[in-house]
């Protein structure tokens, strides 16, 4: 789950991490009131969307008076911001962050992720702050400093100093401030079950202060059950509606660009199914794993999600019956197809427990359901059916 910048900074303040004074607003008049509360004669207006690259897309603007402020907020609210991290439709702008300006002398990058190779949290720092860190990692990986944290003892102050001096910094007062910031970020990361934390940029002001000018936070979805405060921060308007619907039924769904819908039980089998569709000349429209308990209700909801994608011209169902019986799965598929009213061809491959009985039920259903003879046959059949429609 992703957070907006204003939500991320709200968390940073709870951990005594310095951020600029700011207010989130939902209309132009509130922006003027926020500016008066913040003070000063210039402000930064930031569109709140779950995507990077806002500045280049016009989503971050410097305003020099309250008339410009009101105009900028009015121009951004209700629009869809398209950045290099969004699709062509962009993300809806429903909130604006009005923030005080900062006297920037230097921009740094600071981040933390879970490294799957070492199975530990890794903190990263770079002198290349304020730019797309992905490009830095690709073109100049030597400019990214890393420290790996031993979970038995946690982040240690000497590791913070290691990053500090690695950035070419020397001032002792700044070192104490930097250490406090990194230690605070580590506590935030571990206590709130984060999967990604980025401060980009971490700025050094003209007076030598360190301030977190922008913040990006991703939370581990698997831990949301114990993070009730963060769970309430979810903004479903920033998420794909199909994926949101799938989460309600504990279905693992990711929308893709093809026209062949996929419903599979098991993530590995789902990936193999998409590979075989591509190998057979087709394009999968989604990844959808219904999990081990492919009940009638979940199968029905899975079909609803798949057919809600208007690009879908056919559906491939690939089920391996281990504990669950294939004949019961067949009953669920037939019932779901009737209930949802699917008018595109459906190819079903059943393998495992009672697979032959399940295939017979599908064949006897008098519906537009094709029982495949095997994995490869299933992929070839659905590609053929979709090709006929096209």
UniProtKB/Swiss-Prot annotation:
GO CC annotations on file: cytosol; succinate-CoA ligase complex
A Pfam family assignment: ATP-grasp_2
UniProt entry tagged with the keyword Ligase: yes
EC number(s) recorded for this UniProt protein: 6.2.1.5
Key words, A-Z: ATP-binding, Ligase, Magnesium, Metal-binding, Nucleotide-binding, Tricarboxylic acid cycle
Residue ranges of domain ATP-grasp in the record: 9-245
Protein family: Belongs to the succinate/malate CoA ligase beta subunit family.
NCBIfam families: PRK00696.1 (NF001913), sucCoAbeta (TIGR01016)
Name of the featured protein: Succinate--CoA ligase [ADP-forming] subunit beta
Organism: Coxiella burnetii (strain RSA 331 / Henzerling II)
């Amino acid at each position: 789950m992703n957070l907006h910048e204003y939500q991320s900074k709200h968390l940073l303040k709870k951990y005594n991490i310095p951020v600029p004074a700011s207010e989130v607003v939902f209309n132009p008049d509130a922006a003027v009131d926020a500016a008066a509360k913040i003070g000063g004669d210039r402000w930064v207006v930031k569109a709140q969307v779950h995507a990077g690259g806002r500045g280049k897309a016009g989503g971050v603007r410097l305003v020099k008076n309250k008339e410009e402020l009101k105009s900028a907020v009015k121009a951004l609210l209700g629009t869809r911001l398209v950045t290099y991290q969004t699709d062509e439709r962009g993300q809806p702008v429903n909130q604006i962050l009005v923030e005080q300006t900062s006297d920037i002398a230097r921009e740094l990058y600071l981040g933390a992720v879970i490294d799957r190779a070492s199975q530990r949290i890794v903190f990263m720092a770079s002198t290349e702050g304020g730019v797309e860190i992905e490009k830095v990692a690709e073109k100049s990986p030597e400019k990214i400093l890393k420290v790996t944290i031993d979970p038995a003892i946690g982040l240690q102050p000497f590791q913070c100093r290691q990053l500090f001096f690695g950035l070419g910094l020397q001032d002792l007062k700044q070192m104490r401030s930097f250490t406090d910031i990194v230690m605070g970020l580590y506590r935030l990361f571990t206590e709130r079950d984060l999967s990604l934390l980025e401060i980009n940029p971490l700025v050094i002001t003209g007076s030598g202060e360190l301030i977190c000018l922008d913040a990006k936070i991703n939370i581990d979805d698997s831990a949301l059950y114990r993070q009730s405060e963060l769970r309430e921060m979810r903004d479903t308007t920033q998420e794909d509606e199909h994926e949101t619907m799938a989460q309600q039924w504990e279905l693992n769904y990711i929308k893709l660009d093809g026209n062949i819908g996929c419903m599979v039980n098991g993530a590995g089998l789902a990936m193999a199914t998409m590979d075989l569709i591509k190998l057979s000349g087709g394009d999968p429209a989604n990844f959808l794993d219904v999990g081990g308990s492919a009940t009638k209700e979940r199968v029905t909801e899975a079909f609803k999600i798949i057919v809600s994608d208007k690009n879908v011209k056919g559906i491939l169902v690939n089920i391996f019956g281990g504990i669950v019986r294939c004949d019961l799965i067949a009953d669920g598929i037939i019932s779901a197809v009737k209930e949802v009213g699917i008018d595109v061809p459906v190819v079903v491959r059943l393998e495992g427990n009672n697979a032959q009985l399940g295939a017979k039920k599908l064949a006897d259903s008098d519906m537009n359901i094709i029982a495949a003879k095997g994995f490869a046959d299933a992929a070839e059949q659905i590609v053929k059916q979709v090709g006929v429609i096209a």
